[in-house]
């Protein structure tokens, strides 16, 4: 497309070729070309970004997929956004299918809400809008001072189930923990299938029995009620792992938003096999697949892992043929087209509920 006529350009902020595949798919659907830029790491480890064409007065979309080197990808995005802001781009929209640090969106003891810090950094760098997909916590949208479109991958995964899983009508949707039950219920209702929930082996949070007090107790407590102590939350017990729901003689489809460390999925597959499931699928939006994930999946009872291409995982697919990919470039390219043309985004969220 002619940049002067359309008034928008699409750039990729990734410095590695493997991470630009999604950007190429999106631009092909738009009938556009990737903007001319150079992103690379200098010998001293610093990230450098050079914009090789005029972007003055245009809508700029930066596509940034997150590889294993998360911090480098974040710096690439920040520096490119700032470079485009300095070059007088009209609007700078970040297309970040998997939003990094989304697991650090809650306060834990003396930690910090890193996701909120990243949101502030992106705004300071010059971003005016973000398109993302299946945020780990929907409340993350409130961290931003500009619009965030949180698209859903579930329509693509539901379509995969209907078209690629033989005899899917004999399947049951499984939540690998009670926390994932709402997502699993949404899938089950749309496919008119049964629901099962795996419960047990609850992970205890870190206990801190030292109250950190160096001062003497309150005078009233010390004199009137010497035995009074602050009530403490009871520690969680670890009940035996169990499956709530019937999976005997069925296909089990475990659904979640992120597959990173796969030990919990492997354990879930084992218990489902013991309970009579004859085939097991794992489906998620973001396939991070860290560390030994490909080997563990290959050696496990899981028959197939289905993820979208929000995160590049071609190396993991070579290591484990069980991993399959669903392309979501269609919805991202449509979102870009609608935002640039000032059209409603409501159609992309049709039939989406708060539990999706």
Swiss-Prot record:
For this UniProt record, the keywords arranged alphabetically read as follows: Acetylation, Nucleotide biosynthesis, Phosphoprotein
Q: What is one Pfam family matched by this protein? A: Pribosyltran_N
Under SUPFAM superfamilies, the record lists: PRTase-like (SSF53271)
GO molecular function, a single term: enzyme regulator activity
- PTM Phosphoserine: list the residues: 177, 215
An example Gene Ontology CC term for this record: cytoplasm
GO terms in the biological process aspect are: 5-phosphoribose 1-diphosphate biosynthetic process; nucleobase-containing compound metabolic process; purine nucleotide biosynthetic process
The record, for InterPro entries, names: Pribosyltran_N, PRTase-like, Rib-P_diPkinase
UniProt xrefs under Gene3D superfamilies: 3.40.50.2020
- N-acetylmethionine modification sites are 1
| Summary of the tissues where the protein is detected | Ubiquitous.
What does it do? Seems to play a negative regulatory role in 5-phosphoribose 1-diphosphate synthesis.
* Self-association and partners: Binds to PRPS1 and PRPS2.
Question: Sorted alphabetically, which PANTHER family does this protein's record hold?
Answer: PHOSPHORIBOSYL PYROPHOSPHATE SYNTHASE-ASSOCIATED PROTEIN 1 (PTHR10210:SF28), RIBOSE-PHOSPHATE DIPHOSPHOKINASE FAMILY MEMBER (PTHR10210)
Q: Which family does it belong to?
A: Belongs to the ribose-phosphate pyrophosphokinase family.
Q: What is this protein called?
A: Phosphoribosyl pyrophosphate synthase-associated protein 1
């Amino acid at each position: 497309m002619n940049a002067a006529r359309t008034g928008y350009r699409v750039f990729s902020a990734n410095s590695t070729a493997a991470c630009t595949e999604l950007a190429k798919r999106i631009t092909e659907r738009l009938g556009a070309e990737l903007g001319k830029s150079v992103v690379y790491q200098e010998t001293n480890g610093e990230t450098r970004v050079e914009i090789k064409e005029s972007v003055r007065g245009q809508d700029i979309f930066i596509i940034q997929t997150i590889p294993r080197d998360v911090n480098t990808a974040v710096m690439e995005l920040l520096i490119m956004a700032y470079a485009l802001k300095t070059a007088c781009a009209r609007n700078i929209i970040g297309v970040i299918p998997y939003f990094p640090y989304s697991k650090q969106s809650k306060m834990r003891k003396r930690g910090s809400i890193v996701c909120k810090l990243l949101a502030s950094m992106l705004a300071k760098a010059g971003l005016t809008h973000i398109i993302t997909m299946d945020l780990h916590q929907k409340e993350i949208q409130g961290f931003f001072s500009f619009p965030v479109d949180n698209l859903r991958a579930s329509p693509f995964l539901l379509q995969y189930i209907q078209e690629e899983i033989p005899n899917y009508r004999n399947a049951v949707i499984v939540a690998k923990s009670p926390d994932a039950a709402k997502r699993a219920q949404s899938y089950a209702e749309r496919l008119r299938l049964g629901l099962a929930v795996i419960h047990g082996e609850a992970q205890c949070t870190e206990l801190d029995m030292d109250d950190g007090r160096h001062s003497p107790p309150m005078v009233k407590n010390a004199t009137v009620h010497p035995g009074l102590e602050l009530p403490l939350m009871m520690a969680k017990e670890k009940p035996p792992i169990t499956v709530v729901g019937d999976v005997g003689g069925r296909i089990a489809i475990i659904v979640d938003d992120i597959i990173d460390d796969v030990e919990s999925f492997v354990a879930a597959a084992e218990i489902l096999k013991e309970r009579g499931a004859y085939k097991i699928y794992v489906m998620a939006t973001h396939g991070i697949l860290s560390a030994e994930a490909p080997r563990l999946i290959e050696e496990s009872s899981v028959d197939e892992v289905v993820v979208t291409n929000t995160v590049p995982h071609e190396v993991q697919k070579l290591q484990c043929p069980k991993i399959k990919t669903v392309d979501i470039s269609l919805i991202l390219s449509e979102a870009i087209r609608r935002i640039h043309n000032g059209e409603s985004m409501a159609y992309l969220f049709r039939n989406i509920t708060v539990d999706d």
